[in-house]
Regions:
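Extended, charge-rich alpha-helical regions
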Residues: 1-89, 93, 101, 105-108, ...
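Long acidic/polar interaction regions in large eukaryotic complex-forming proteins
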Residues: 64, 75-100, 109, 113-130, ...
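Amphipathic alpha-helical protein-interaction segments enriched in hydrophobic
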Residues: 343-355, 430-432
Length: 532
């Protein structure tokens, strides 16, 4: 499989500011971001204006290679092309580096003392929880049962499906998402750092996690498809799924954009199988699979037609880094869901839930499959059905996370799986990752403990302007953008002596004030000593 990219030169500028509504939003369905008035109990910190968030930050020579991350705005679906396009901007968060000196020292009452890193904290769900506003559990877009109900592909197309590299997704989807567990982790996700903030520091879903849990490739091309007009979506359905123009138009009209219902795709798959149109049947099967897994959106019923583009030539589908696609879409959905006004979580729920099962065994009450085969994706190791997923509410999980210590985390969990899925150095690449018009920052420098190194204070995030071509070039030359190896951990989860104190200043290690007042829960609580 090639590490290179297709030669398409995209004249599209990517702005580092955040794509909340990204891939899965259905226009006109009320799923976009909305503004929310501050409550009377919220910390009295003025919310940054849109113009302030959009300011370009000068990148200094010291930070020219450092990535930066997203902060959202209400916008149209970037996957759907506007009527007239001159410059298409893909946004990612304007975060650290944009605060004034006064802002840096203002802080938030009782929790975040230095807001220079988590600049969107005032609009974050963690701020709402801290001030006593109980947020409802997120609605999940979990389609594991849809995948299982469709079943494995018919024998005539099984070879085509396996050849795309996507077949591991057929078997590893969980049936039931744990709303309480996932909501508790979303509360700790921050777009500025692309990581979860916990009492012992930061952790994130890495490229190695995507590779090990899903057995998807993390080496290959990043798909460079462009936003799609509805007319183009209709033509794509006609060409690739062999439907009539009238049927395609009726379906996109019903979905109010370049989308089709998952049920409609299942019906097309069955019809193409009956007619013996095997290539079209394989494309329909894969579109349904992608819509239920990697690209699950908050509509919970639709899939974007644009994903068919990667299935146009099935012999070339395997060249894409599908593990990157999973991570990009998951990060983007987490970025959106962690804002205080959000009520839904899209993305591949299996990836997030099984990542939690693997790294936090003391938090999640998971059920292991006794018949698990080590040759299968690691996500197949757990059984998550309505019977096995316990109805534990978010506050209980919040309490468990507030009590976590370094020793409670499984920092390097795939040792016994390396014979099946080897570690690739590309997992330590830092910078922007993209899939179509969606771009997110991948920041392994903040979580080097997950690679076996001692965590030190990372450089502050810096905002910058880059083009899609720049993302391609960096990814192609990934060896120039690998996080430097530091000191190897003697004890798993080790960090430098100044790291925890720094982290407690720039973050909110605890979600509730009661735990913040308990020094014995602090990861840097002093050891007892004999006083003479």
């Amino acid at each position: 499989m090639s590490d290179g990219f297709c030669g398409t030169h995209l004249q599209i500028m990517v702005r580092t500011r955040g794509l909340g509504c990204a891939l899965g939003q259905v226009t006109g369905r009320g799923l976009g971001r909305g503004d929310r008035d501050d409550s009377d109990d919220a910390p009295q910190r003025r919310r940054p204006t849109a113009s302030a968030r959009r300011q370009q930050v000068t990148v200094t020579a010291d930070h020219v290679d450092e990535p930066v991350i997203p902060a959202p705005d209400v916008q149209d679906d970037p996957m759907e092309a506007p009527a007239a396009v001159e410059d298409i901007l893909a946004d990612i968060p304007a975060d650290a580096g944009t605060e004034t000196v006064e802002d840096q020292h203002q802080g938030f009452l009782g929790c975040l003392s230095d807001p220079s890193v988590l600049t969107a904290y005032a609009d974050h769900v963690a701020c709402s929880v801290w001030t006593g506003e109980e947020c409802p559990e997120l609605k999940l877009s979990s389609h594991g049962r849809k995948v299982q109900s469709l079943g494995r592909p018919v024998p005539a197309i099984e070879g085509l499906i396996v050849g795309t590299g996507l077949s591991p997704l057929i078997a590893c989807s969980v049936d039931t998402g744990d709303r309480g567990l996932l909501s508790a982790f979303v509360e700790r996700w921050h777009r500025e750092t692309s990581s979860f903030h916990l009492p012992m520091g930061e952790l994130t879903i890495t490229l190695d996690d995507a590779s090990s849990l899903l057995h998807l490739p993390i080496i290959g091309d990043l798909h460079a498809f462009e936003p799609l007009h509805v007319d183009d979506a209709v033509q794509m359905l006609v060409d690739l799924l062999m439907v009539s123009p009238e049927s395609a138009r009726a379906e996109t009209d019903q979905c109010r954009g370049p989308y089709v219902r998952l049920q409609w795709v299942r019906d097309i798959y069955q019809r193409r199988c009956q007619a013996g149109h095997w290539t079209a049947a394989a494309r329909a099967y894969l579109l349904h699979l992608l819509g239920c897994t990697l690209f699950a959106n908050k509509s919970a019923t639709n899939v974007h037609v644009v994903y068919l583009e990667a299935l146009r030539d099935l012999s070339m589908t395997e060249r894409y880094a599908w593990g990157v696609a999973a991570l990009v879409h998951m990060y983007d959905q987490l970025n959106d869901a962690s804002m205080s006004h959000s009520r839904h979580l899209g993305g591949y729920i299996t990836l997030l839930q099984c990542w939690i099962y693997k790294h936090f065994p003391s938090v999640a009450e998971s059920t292991a499959d006794q018949d698990y085969d080590e040759a299968s994706p690691r996500a197949c190791r757990w059984i998550a059905t309505k019977k096995t997923v316990k109805s534990i509410r978010t506050p209980s999980y919040r309490e468990r996370l507030d009590r976590l210590r370094i020793s409670d985390v499984c920092w390097i969990p795939y040792g016994e799986h390396r014979e099946v899925r080897d570690f690739h150095v590309r997992s330590c690449y830092f910078g922007l990752l993209r899939w179509g018009p969606v771009a997110v920052y991948y920041r392994p420098e903040r979580v080097v403990r997950q690679f076996g190194y001692t965590q030190t204070i990372p450089a502050p995030p810096v905002d910058s302007w880059v083009s899609y071509d720049d993302i391609h070039d960096r990814w192609m030359h990934y060896k120039d953008y690998i996080v430097p190896a530091g000191e190897v951990c003697v004890v798993p989860g080790a960090c430098s002596s100044d790291y925890i104190d720094w982290f407690f200043r720039i973050s909110h290690p605890f979600m509730t004030p009661d735990h913040a007042l308990d020094p014995m829960l602090h990861g840097h609580a002093p050891q007892s000593r004999v006083v003479p």
